[in-house]
């Protein structure tokens, strides 16, 4: 461990010095603008509905309670979703007793906002979450013509005859055989794997994306997926299936239905590059008046295949904690630059690295 920390320290200390303009802003606003921190949420700051004990102290350190005596910009980068950025910020703020703004939150589907100009008025199927919650988020992002699997079941219950929608179900009724889909977007975990697998595969292989039309031997509309995590951690003693499990099922069903054809899709969420570019834009916007880009970004996560793989590929410094799905010495396939017990230790290491560099 000592050699690993020394390597990280050496690499950080060799980075270029802070530009003078950034130093002036730093001293004027008491911000340490040369670095930024990105936290995963589940398994790092919280575990299900329980907070991780060191989380609040870690955020306090970044708020200026550190040997730098300066604030360090930070953001939350999660593969979770199904709520708005504001709702997630409010939820985590309540849990930790620490104010976090919506501008600091990147959800798995946040970068999908960039698709809104392309599909502004087009009919899209949004999958995931309860009722029309994800459809509401899509509307907020700028998608104006959105339907959900439950809307389709309300139109033709026999399309998935294993459920009965109650009177409380929020649905928008329309004649789906007259309104073809231009795209399918999976925003969040499926709340009914069977229903969603059936409906998504129906749309993907129907001529022109029109439900009820003949099946064709190819994919007819684009598919966008938001969270590749196969598992996630909550209050249960062992990890649970995540949205990535739905993706695996969808690919398997598609292969079986099309005699081995490959499913084509665009992925969002960690560990994919689009998510990290979006997070960097969020971090830059937090200190936009200073007009400074962060030279070092530290990513703290618990999932080697998502948090660590993505951070390493983005050129960030990755720190793996043992409070979520990982509990070993380091991951063999996606090794982190540093491995620590919890988020408090992670932020302490970051402050130590930045303090040593800052005082040179």
What are these regions (language model features)?
Residues 71:
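An N-terminal RHG(E/S)-centered segment typical of histidine phosphatases
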Residues 2-5, 9-41, 46-68, 81-106, ...:
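Asp-based, Mg2+/Mn2+-dependent phosphohydrolase catalytic module
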């Amino acid at each position: 461990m000592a050699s690993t920390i020394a390597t990280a320290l050496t690499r950080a200390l060799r980075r270029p010095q802070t530009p003078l303009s950034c130093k002036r802003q730093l001293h004027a606003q008491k911000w340490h603008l040369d670095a930024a921190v990105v936290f995963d949420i589940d398994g790092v700051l919280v575990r299900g509905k329980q907070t991780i004990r060191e989380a609040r102290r870690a955020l306090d350190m970044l708020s200026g309670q550190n040997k730098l005596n300066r604030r360090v910009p930070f953001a939350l980068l999660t593969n979770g979703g199904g709520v708005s950025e504001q709702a997630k910020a409010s939820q985590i703020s309540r849990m930790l007793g620490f104010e976090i703004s919506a501008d600091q939150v990147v959800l798995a589907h946040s970068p999908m906002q960039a698709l809104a100009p392309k599909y502004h008025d087009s009919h899209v199927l949004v999958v995931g979450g309860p009722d029309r919650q994800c459809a509401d988020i899509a509307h907020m992002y700028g998608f104006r013509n959105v339907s959900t699997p439950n809307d389709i079941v309300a139109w033709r219950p026999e399309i998935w005859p294993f459920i009965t929608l109650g009177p409380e179900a929020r649905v928008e009724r329309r004649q789906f055989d007259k309104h073809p889909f231009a795209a399918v977007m999976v925003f969040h975990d499926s709340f009914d794997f069977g229903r969603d697998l059936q409906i998504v595969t129906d749309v993907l292989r129907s001529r022109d994306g029109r439900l009820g039309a003949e099946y064709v031997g190819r994919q007819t509309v684009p598919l966008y997926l938001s969270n590749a995590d196969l598992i996630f951690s909550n209050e249960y003693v062992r990890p649970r299936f995540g949205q990535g499990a739905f993706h695996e099922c969808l690919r398997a069903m598609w292969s079986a239905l099309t005699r081995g054809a490959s499913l084509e899709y665009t992925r969002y969420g960690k560990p994919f590059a689009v998510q990290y570019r979006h997070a960097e834009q969020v971090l830059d916007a937090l200190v936009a008046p200073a007009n400074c880009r962060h030279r070092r970004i530290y990513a703290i996560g618990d999932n080697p295949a998502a948090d660590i793989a993505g951070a390493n590929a983005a050129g960030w410094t990755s720190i793996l904690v043992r409070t979520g799905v990982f509990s070993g010495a380091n991951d063999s396939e996606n090794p982190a630059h540093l491995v620590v017990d919890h988020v408090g230790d992670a932020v302490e290491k970051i402050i130590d690295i930045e303090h040593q560099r800052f005082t040179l």
